[in-house]
Design a protein with these regions (language model features):
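ABC family nucleotide-binding domain
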Residues: 1-152
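C-terminal boundary and immediately downstream tail of ABC-type ATPase nucleotide-binding domains
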Residues: 149, 153-174
Length: 174
């Protein structure tokens, strides 16, 4: 009940499908939970929203509707919306898998900054360059099982399992 609600309030989530409200502006997407859930004053919520939208590089899009933004921009709005609730932990589920290749880096760059600022993040990703750069730990899973857990350097330089070696040989060919 209440304990679960309190825990959820400390966890931000960003999914591959951005889950923005299509009928709300970008600014309103970020302020909605601040006003309705956190009971923040509207002006204060709007200022925080603009600060966060600036942080992820889409503050100039604040008055637009989600359909007017690229996928990469929408995903950065989703990150700003999650950050607005001041979570202790951010969960990312394949945040770049639905994006065009040229949009991927703009989302990953924001996530790298968050990691370097000390945000605790759990990220499901196939973006190995990003994982290597941003992670403190790599947990390699296959078929629902944890096969390896290590530092990024150890995982990429000395994978322990045949499955990890095979995966890395296929994904790191270029």
């Amino acid at each position: 009940g209440k304990e679960l609600a309190n825990l959820r309030a400390e966890v931000g989530m960003v999914f591959q499908s951005f889950n923005l409200f299509a009928n709300k502006t970008i600014r309103e997407n970020v302020t909605l939970a601040l006003i309705k859930v956190r009971h923040m004053d509207k002006k204060e919520a709007e200022q925080l929203a603009m600060d966060l939208l600036a942080r992820v590089g889409v503050d100039s899009q604040a008055s637009k509707m989600p359909s007017q933004l690229s996928g990469g921009q929408q995903q950065r709005v989703a990150i700003a919306r999650a950050l607005a609730m001041r979570p202790k932990v951010m969960l990312f589920d394949e945040p770049t898998s639905a994006l065009d290749p040229e949009m991927i880096n703009e989302v990953l760059d924001v996530m790298v900054v968050l990691a370097h600022e000390g945000m605790t993040m759990i990220c499901v990703t196939h973006e190995m360059g990003f994982a290597r750069k941003a992670a403190d730990r790599i947990v390699f899973m296959s078929d629902g099982q944890i096969l390896e857990e290590n530092t990024p350097d150890e995982f990429f330089e000395h994978p322990q399992t045949d499955r990890a070696k095979d995966f890395l040989s296929k994904i790191l060919t270029h």
